């Protein structure tokens, strides 16, 4: 319940920031704002200052900015007018350039919010938990896998030292580079049993995410960092710093190998050989299977903790801008991938899933430490802000990008667009957005139930 509340509040703040951008720009352009609400739904409190009524509404789902003249378009349709009626201080009383500015200000507020939260992450520093640069290919434990790792012959225990001109220390380094280079050849330097090897790997494009993948797991040594208090490992008596050596007498070296071996057993329990304080011990662990047949042992493996120090004010602002630009580029590429084989229905998420993920990220991060939770939450919020920035600027009627497009056409033609033409364009835009929303809602429902 807590993570749902966190998700709703954070997503609401992101949407409110968007509306605040429209609000400030409207006042700057001398367009009267009749109402500005924090929250949606029934109004709990209202107070008028000047010409604007400020409201506090019941549902913390963002807010809205009501400008004078927004309904003039409907008036023109009802009265079958050839132009949208104009009154002083209304939206259509200002020129197309100012209307473009008002429409652009909402998405701009979101991208500025992304810069601010990412600058905060850089200023505070962060801790990243990751594993080393040794890998375990998926195909070794899944015969149906035909990933690039199999095609180039990567082996269990290989160590990736370099990709292109980038040195590799951690598995997260591999993920970052590979994910951004789908279907682009990358030179790898690999160490295998003391020998250096040079191979070229072209990551496949994942049909669900659009990101590159080569088909590898991280090679995780079997040293226990923590056990789930209600899990099988805890009931078997395993403790932090234990090292698992064997399963039913068969030697194991890393986590993927362990889980694959446990999955083979049809018994209800199995004996683990464990090294604790230099002495061998034997623990019988129950084999608890998940819905998809995987084994859940309730163990968190010991990882590397990488401490990223905080930066100065100006350095953090530069880092915030650079990371926001990187996110913008990746988001635009992701939209382009929708037309190049990416599974559209699986690639979009709606507010339910976004809310759930925000809350999940925050809850797990804050359980580890305040700094980790804040950093992870800020990074995900920045991603949501960038997504709203890009999506709202798409030239689709009823979105901010559509309003900007109409203003550009009006500026070029030196006359306003006929209300009936606007109506048909907005109807098409509404149908398109509604279709996307239905797909996102369906994906959200499937996500929550599975």
UniProtKB/Swiss-Prot annotation:
Keyword Coiled coil listed: no
A Pfam family it matches: Peptidase_M50
Presence of keyword Zinc: yes
Cellular compartments per GO CC: plasma membrane
Compartments where found: Cell inner membrane
EC number: 3.4.24.-
TM regions (residue ranges): 102-124, 384-406, 421-443
Identification of the protein by name: Putative zinc metalloprotease TP_0600
Cofactor: Zn(2+)
Membrane-topology descriptor: Multi-pass membrane protein
SMART domains given in the database record: PDZ
Catalytic site positions: 19
Family under the similarity heading: Belongs to the peptidase M50B family.
């Amino acid at each position: 319940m807590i993570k749902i509340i966190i998700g709703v509040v954070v997503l609401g703040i992101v949407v409110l920031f968007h509306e605040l951008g429209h609000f400030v720009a409207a006042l700057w352009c001398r367009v009267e704002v009749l109402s500005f609400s924090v929250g949606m739904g029934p109004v709990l409190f209202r107070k008028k200052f000047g010409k604007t009524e400020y409201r506090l509404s019941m549902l913390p789902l963002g807010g809205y900015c009501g400008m004078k003249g927004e309904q003039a378009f409907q008036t023109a349709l009802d009265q079958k007018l050839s132009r949208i009626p104009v009154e002083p201080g209304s939206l259509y009383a200002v020129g197309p350039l100012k209307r473009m500015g008002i429409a652009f200000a909402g998405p701009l507020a979101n991208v500025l919010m992304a810069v601010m939260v990412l600058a905060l992450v850089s200023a505070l520093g962060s801790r990243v938990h990751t594993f080393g640069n040794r890998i375990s290919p998926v195909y070794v434990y899944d015969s149906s896998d035909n990933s690039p790792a199999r095609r180039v012959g990567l082996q269990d225990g290989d160590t990736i030292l370099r990709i292109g001109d980038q040195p590799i220390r951690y598995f997260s380094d591999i993920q970052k580079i590979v994910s951004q280079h789908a279907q682009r050849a990358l030179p790898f330097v690999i160490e295998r049993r003391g020998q250096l090897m040079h191979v070229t790997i072209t990551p496949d494009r994942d049909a669900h995410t659009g990101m590159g993948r080569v088909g590898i797991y991280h090679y995780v040594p079997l040293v226990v960092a923590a056990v789930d208090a209600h899990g099988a490992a805890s009931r078997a008596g395993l403790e932090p710093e234990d090292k698992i050596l064997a399963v039913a007498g068969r030697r194991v070296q890393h986590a993927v190998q362990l889980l694959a071996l446990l999955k083979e057993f049809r018994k209800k329990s199995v004996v683990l050989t464990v090294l604790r304080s230099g002495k061998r011990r034997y623990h019988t662990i129950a084999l608890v299977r998940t819905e998809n047949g995987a084994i859940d042992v309730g163990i968190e493996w010991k990882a590397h903790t990488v401490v990223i120090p905080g930066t100065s004010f100006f350095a953090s602002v530069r880092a915030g801008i650079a990371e926001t630009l990187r996110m913008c580029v990746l988001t635009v590429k992701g939209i382009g991938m929708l037309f190049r084989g990416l599974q559209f229905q699986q690639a979009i998420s709606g507010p339910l899933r976004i809310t759930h993920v925000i809350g999940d990220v925050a809850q797990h991060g804050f359980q580890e430490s305040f700094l980790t939770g804040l950093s992870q939450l800020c990074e995900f919020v920045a991603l949501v802000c960038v997504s709203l920035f890009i999506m709202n600027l798409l030239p689709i009627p009823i979105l901010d990008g559509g309003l900007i497009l109409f203003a550009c056409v009006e500026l070029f033609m030196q006359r306003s667009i006929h209300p009936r033409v606007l109506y048909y364009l907005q109807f098409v835009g509404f149908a398109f957005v509604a279709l996307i929303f239905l797909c996102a809602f369906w994906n959200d429902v499937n996500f929550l139930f599975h």
